[in-house]
């Protein structure tokens, strides 16, 4: 693995470490401001990855799949970051501190609408990541050095199309609530 691939691994681990630390400090130690400070570090992690990728390419490295995945990671992190923190917050409150409401399980049209919002968020992530990929391709201006970036962009375009089809299927075949054990007599 090259340095950018390791940087992606580091950033993903750092992302979840600062979230868990932020939630633990916030709810277990009752230090809300310090907890918020940890949670606010998540965009800094994205900036570190963006800077590392930019510096590597600026120094003349040929773009690899890792450089493309870095752009995807940043797009997803920006588009989904707040939602991922809210998800972790709900789970942490309910399962760790034993407070708050049980995380909601969605069914039927509620599940379909939630899936559609997720797909729109995926489109936002795609636009951010594709913009970064297109920017790298433009600034490098050497197709032999950017083949991997173009490949990542094409693959992500196919993936977003598949995600759309899956999301549309939720409206056609809504997710049904499973019958509970108490109702099966």
UniProtKB/Swiss-Prot annotation:
Keywords: Cell membrane, Membrane, Transmembrane, Transmembrane helix
Top-level division of the source organism's lineage: Bacteria
SS bond list: none
A cellular component annotation (GO) from this entry: plasma membrane
Compartment annotation: Cell membrane
Primary residence: membrane
Membrane-protein topology: Multi-pass membrane protein
Residue ranges crossing the lipid bilayer per the database entry: 4-24, 35-55, 60-80, 123-143, 152-172
Chain coiled-coil ranges: none
Name of protein: Uncharacterized membrane protein YmcC
The organism of origin for this protein: Bacillus subtilis (strain 168)
């Amino acid at each position: 693995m090259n340095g950018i691939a390791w940087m992606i691994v580091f950033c993903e681990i750092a992302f979840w470490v600062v979230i868990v630390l932020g939630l633990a400090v916030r709810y277990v130690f009752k230090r809300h401001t310090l907890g918020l400070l940890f949670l606010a570090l998540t965009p800094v992690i994205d900036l570190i990855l963006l800077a590392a990728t930019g510096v590597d390419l600026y120094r003349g490295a040929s773009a690899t799949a890792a450089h493309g995945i870095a752009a995807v990671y940043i797009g997803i992190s920006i588009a989904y970051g707040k939602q991922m923190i809210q998800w972790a917050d709900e789970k942490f409150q309910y399962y760790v501190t034993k407070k708050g409401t049980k995380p909601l399980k969605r069914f039927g049209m509620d599940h379909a609408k939630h899936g559609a919002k997720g797909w729109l968020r995926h489109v936002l992530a795609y636009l951010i990541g594709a913009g970064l990929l297109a920017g790298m391709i433009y600034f490098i201006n050497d197709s032999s050095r950017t083949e991997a970036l173009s490949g990542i962009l094409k693959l992500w375009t196919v993936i977003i199309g598949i995600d759309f089809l899956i999301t549309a299927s939720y409206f056609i075949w809504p997710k049904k609530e499973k019958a509970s054990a108490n109702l099966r007599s």
